[in-house]
Amino acid sequence: MRIGILGYGRFGRALASLLREAGHPHQAWDPTAEIPGECRAAGPEGLVAACEALVLAVPIPALAGALGQVRPFLRPEQLVFDVGSVKVGPCALLDAHLGAAIPHAGTHPLFGPVSLARAERPLRVVLCPSPLHPAAADRLESLFHSLGCEVLRQSPEDHDRVMATTHALTFFIAKGLLDVGAGAELPFTPPSFHAIAHTLESVQEDAGHLFAVLQNQNPFALGARVGLLEALSAIHQSLAEAVASGTEEQLAIPDLGTRSPVLQEARNHIDTLDQELVALLARRTELVLRAGRAKADMGLPIHDPERESAQLQARRAWAQEAGLDIQGVEDVFRAVLRASRAAQGK
């Protein structure tokens, strides 16, 4: 399928890389962004003329203007979709501008430039079909499957309700923590903060305009924020009351250890870590394949014994620093390297 990408910001570029890897020819147009010459369209009209499906990869506040810009050039056999993080408003705009004449649907890819660069998997997409064009949703689902994505169908309202209590609240909490200095360089942190620190890092790596969009464009975000603030206020007040009444134990967060034996808890954690290791190996394989394609473009051989030797030496040093069995860690990474060569067909 020939794809046109209107908007070549961080997500537009990331989507282009997925399309390239899947073998979908594509062009892009953006009035300000730098686009590789081989896929740069001459303008909006040329972009629309050359594609079978048009991706509106623009910020949500710019969506109405983008639709007005391309609408005169669209044809009934084409397919149009957006990729915004909010769906109620954008889906309504698609219906209003394109109506019954142009097939369309709303989508929200639950990944971005950072997760793609890290080769995080699985890739998931929420698809919001338009009642005017049920067949368009089927075409879009096939397209995303060809990119290696899992697809979940939701109404725009159901999507935004879930995003209000997950995506929007995550950014809201993260901004609060950053504003009180929790994201600054700290001399030490407990393990319980590590996941939060990762969240803060992820939020800071996202597009700067996304915070306001998630809070102000999602019709359910205000209610989610109010509910959270009320819950935090109640907890804050109950802390003082518990001290006065001597009932602080009632505020304790349920402890996993009180519900499962120590051995079972340890085994559960081991299983979870092993799942994470497998997911990391999948991500590593994706990066290895990406490196292999880059080598092929440069005319370099896939197998690089000198680099493998340096890798093993570095991993032995890491093992020593961590107090692990050096030979055991080397054996693990030799197996990883064998798997990498097998994935590359070498």
Predicted regions and their residues:
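Rossmann-like NAD(P)-binding element
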Residues: E45-L74
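Internal alpha-helical scaffold of NAD(P)-dependent oxidoreductase catalytic cores
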Residues: P122-Q204
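Domain-level signature for soluble enzymes in the chorismate/prephenate branch of the shikimate pathway
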Residues: V86, P90, A137, F144, ...
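Interdomain hinge/lid region at the active-site interface
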Residues: P187-G257
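Rossmann-like NAD(P)(H) cofactor-binding subdomain of soluble oxidoreductases
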Residues: A64-L116
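NAD(P)+-binding Rossmann beta1-loop-alpha1 motif at the extreme N-terminus of oxidoreductases
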Residues: M1-G46
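Short glycine-/small-residue-rich Rossmann-like dinucleotide-binding loops
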Residues: V58-I60, S85, S130
